[in-house]
């Protein structure tokens, strides 16, 4: 597989074309950002940890019947993925109250949500990824009603699979965001799944083991990521 020019550079990943029109290469960088890119730092080993963590999770989801864009690891910081036509919507599943939900509704952090909630946000950094609903997605042409049904179904399936996986590792899956795209007419899970895009707390101590350590200045960010990977059995 020949790596060609950079197609897109995000806050923490770069996307490259290949000699196959249906495949792209994702490069996980050490860049770590918060507050819609207003704060950016370099954290050693982060690209490698997130790349291998993402590969592990995507393979677990594939085994559970969730279609993903992941094909294979290419190295410590790179993987080969399917080229998706991305839907510009973030799907957020919450099992416990945290983050923007706490700020928006004034509820106490850590409350268990039963049932888990499903939310949509427009993927737009300039506008702060605003909270939207299903009718917005359809009315503005960001996706179809049928695609939304499938995205919600897959998001809840991911929650079912990963909640158990993390629970078995002594961790609470507090919340997470997913992005989807279309590959040959099928809705497929895209982007990544890593501690950058979810909240994970230790079951016993409620210690934060995710990107909130960076956002909140708690320190030991990569050490926490590596601890999560170790508990799951991710080969680093």
UniProtKB/Swiss-Prot annotation:
Pathway(s) the chain acts in: Purine metabolism; IMP biosynthesis via de novo pathway; 5-amino-1-(5-phospho-D-ribosyl)imidazole-4-carboxamide from 5-amino-1-(5-phospho-D-ribosyl)imidazole-4-carboxylate: step 1/2
Gene Ontology biological process terms from the UniProt entry: 'de novo' IMP biosynthetic process; cobalamin biosynthetic process
Alphabetical list of SUPFAM superfamilies matching this protein: SAICAR synthase-like
Entry superkingdom: Bacteria
Keyword terms of this UniProt record: ATP-binding, Ligase, Nucleotide-binding, Purine biosynthesis
Keyword Nucleotide-binding: yes
Classification via PROSITE patterns: SAICAR_SYNTHETASE_1, SAICAR_SYNTHETASE_2
MF annotations from Gene Ontology: ATP binding; phosphoribosylaminoimidazolesuccinocarboxamide synthase activity
InterPro entries: SAICAR_synt/ADE2_N, SAICAR_synt_PurC, SAICAR_synth, SAICAR_synthetase, SAICAR_synthetase_CS
UniProt GO cellular component terms: cytosol
Pfam families: SAICAR_synt
The enzyme's E.C. designation: 6.3.2.6
UniProt similarity note: Belongs to the SAICAR synthetase family.
Record-given protein name: Phosphoribosylaminoimidazole-succinocarboxamide synthase
């Amino acid at each position: 597989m020949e790596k060609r020019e950079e197609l897109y550079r995000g806050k923490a990943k770069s996307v490259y074309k290949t000699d196959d029109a249906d495949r792209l290469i994702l490069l996980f960088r050490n860049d770590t950002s918060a507050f819609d890119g207003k704060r950016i730092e370099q954290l050693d080993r982060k690209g490698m940890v997130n790349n291998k963590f993402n590969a592990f999770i995507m393979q677990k989801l594939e085994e559970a019947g969730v279609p993903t864009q992941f094909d294979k690891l290419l190295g410590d910081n790179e993987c080969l993925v399917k080229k998706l036509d991305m839907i510009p919507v973030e799907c957020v599943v919450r099992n416990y109250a945290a983050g923007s939900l706490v700020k928006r509704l004034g509820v106490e952090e850590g409350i268990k949500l039963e049932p888990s909630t499903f939310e949509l946000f427009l993927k737009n950094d300039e506008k702060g990824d605003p909270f939207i609903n299903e009718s917005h997605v359809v009315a503005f042409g960001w996706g179809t009603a049928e695609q939304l049904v499938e995205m919600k179904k897959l998001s809840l399936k991911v929650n079912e699979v990963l909640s158990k996986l993390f629970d078995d590792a002594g961790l609470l899956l507090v919340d997470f965001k997913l992005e989807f795209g279309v590959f040959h007419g099928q809705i497929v899970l895209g982007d990544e799944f890593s501690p950058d895009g979810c909240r994970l707390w230790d079951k016993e101590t409620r210690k934060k083991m995710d990107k909130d350590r960076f956002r909140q200045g708690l320190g030991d960010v990569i050490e926490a990521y590596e601890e999560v990977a170790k508990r799951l059995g991710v080969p680093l």
